[in-house]
Design a protein with these regions (language model features):
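Single conserved hydrophobic/aromatic residue that forms the stacking wall/gate
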Residues: 1-7, 11
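Conserved, mostly hydrophobic/aromatic
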Residues: 17, 53
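Repeat-mediated protein-protein interaction surfaces in helical alpha-solenoids
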Residues: 26-36
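C-terminal amphipathic alpha-helical interaction region
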Residues: 35, 49, 62-208
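Short amphipathic alpha-helical heptad-repeat segments
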Residues: 38-49
Length: 208
């Protein structure tokens, strides 16, 4: 899928931002906008790639399905890397701020659980499966993309791959695979990692 299909205006805008990025290196406002704008282009590329995955599945083209779904998953990891270069787009910052509200270890754990639930299942199984609240917050954040969304998409693609092969896999219980993340206590750093300008250049190469 070429850059032209992602949207000419979006590509021109993002290419211009990246082309002058080195001149504004260290400018906090520019670098924030750069990451946010390039993130949008990457998300749009992912949306189009998802359409390619769907088309391949409906056509029963196993090879094309594997190729398209693999590229889609790679885009998730690339976006996770991009967003990790800014603290504002890290799930670690969200969790850190939530835990800071607690005075005792028990309160900190409770606030972290609430923070994790709010951006994923929004509550228990009833809320997620029957209340229409799963992904209500819809956050594109470093850490969340790699450890939550990537896992879920890969499981779904594996399910569809088996269907293409003529197998009858069990239906996916998404809540059962999502809930463990909401109850986990694995640490996420709130500190930015990597050079946002260099990663933005990588993203534009992937989009174009």
């Amino acid at each position: 899928i070429s850059c032209s299909l992602v949207g000419s205006e979006m590509c021109i805008r993002d290419s211009l931002m990246v082309s002058v990025a080195d001149r504004f290196k260290g400018n906090n406002n520019f670098e924030y906008d750069l990451v946010d704008i390039v993130r949008q282009a990457l998300a749009e590329k992912g949306r189009l790639m998802q359409k390619a995955v769907t088309a391949a599945y409906r056509a029963g083209d196993k090879q094309l399905f594997a190729l398209a779904s693999g590229k889609f998953l790679d885009l998730i990891l690339l976006q996770d890397k991009l967003l990790g270069t800014r603290p504002e787009f890290r799930v670690g910052k969200w969790i850190e701020e939530a835990r800071a509200l607690g005075d005792t270890p028990e309160e900190k754990e409770l606030y972290e659980w609430n923070a994790r639930v709010q951006i994923t299942t929004w509550g228990n199984r009833n809320a997620a499966d029957y209340g229409g609240l799963r992904d209500y917050a819809h956050k594109e954040w470093n850490g969340l993309l790699k450890d939550f969304y990537y896992m879920r998409w890969k499981l779904y693609f594996d399910f569809l791959s088996q269907r293409i092969e003529g197998k009858t896999p069990a239906e996916i219980d998404f809540y059962a695979i999502e809930e463990p993340w909401t109850k986990a206590a694995n640490p996420y750093s709130a500190e930015a990692e990597g050079d946002c300008i260099e990663v933005a250049k990588q993203v534009m190469q992937a989009v174009e």
